[in-house]
Design a protein with these regions (language model features):
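Active-site neighborhoods and metal-handling regions in enzymes and metal-associated proteins
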Residues: 1-243
Length: 243
């Protein structure tokens, strides 16, 4: 029984948007010797997808019917689960009736080996992201030559450039747009109430990414926006050498 959402998405080759920034569906999966089951909100499944899954030997069930399904199964069944990802309620329900064996899920190692289609998709996603970032760098330099901008304005503009690609789906996480001292804060998050103005001097960090139909990107860049102090130059160089 699988409950880790990215593993299920990979195993059945399905994508959804149930969780912000992540192309996964809230679901469970059970794989038997000769067939498989997917527990998911059925209104998300089109007739075409349902037919394709059926052809692949995958039976669909309502997400909330997992326990009902398990209650109807032969008590002689044995279920294998990864307790690093299986939640407490599911594990307890299984253990009341069945033999449960704790294993490490085989999927992470399997999906770590990329096929040609996946590799080509990654490269294409990176090229698409490079186009958006090039536009962003040009825009940032020109805007700052006219007036300061806020950290959120910069983040929103980067998303707009990415979304110009027809195969852009969403950002892959909330953009970290951090100017000056804010860039030193781990996972800094600008808000309308608390953010800094960006000026044509000092250092600006942007940590962002996108979900494209072909793959996912995640980049971090630290940009000099004007003349730097000797300390800024030294810090930047030491960080670069340490990578």
């Amino acid at each position: 029984l699988f409950s880790c959402l990215d593993e299920i998405a990979w195993l059945y080759n399905i994508r959804c948007n149930d969780i912000a920034y992540n192309p996964v569906a809230i679901s469970y999966a059970i794989v038997e010797k000769d067939k498989a089951h997917l527990f998911i909100k059925l209104d998300k499944i089109s007739q075409e997808i349902e037919q394709q899954l059926a052809e692949d030997g995958i039976e669909l069930h309502d997400y909330h019917h997992l326990f009902l399904f398990l209650d109807e199964q032969n008590k002689e069944n044995t279920y294998f689960v990864d307790t690093n990802t299986c939640n407490y309620a599911v594990f307890n329900h299984l253990a009341k009736k069945f033999e449960v064996r704790e294993i490490e899920s085989p999927i992470p190692l399997l999906k770590a080996v990329k096929n040609t289609t996946e590799l080509d998709g990654f490269r294409l996603a990176c090229r698409k992201d490079g186009v958006a970032l090039s536009k962003f760098y040009y825009w940032l330099e020109n805007r700052l030559s006219q007036q300061p901008i806020t950290e959120l304005e910069a983040a929103e503009q980067l998303t707009r450039f990415r979304s110009q690609d027809k195969e852009y789906v969403s950002d892959s996480f909330g953009c970290i747009s951090a100017y000056g001292p804010n860039a030193a804060l781990p996972h800094y998050s600008a808000t309308p109430e608390q953010q800094s103005e960006i000026h044509p001097k000092g250092l600006y960090l942007v940590d962002s990414g996108a979900q494209y139909m072909h793959g996912t990107t995640d980049i971090t860049r630290t940009m000099p926006l004007g003349e730097l102090t000797e300390l800024e130059k030294e810090d930047y160089t030491l960080v670069l050498k340490g990578m």
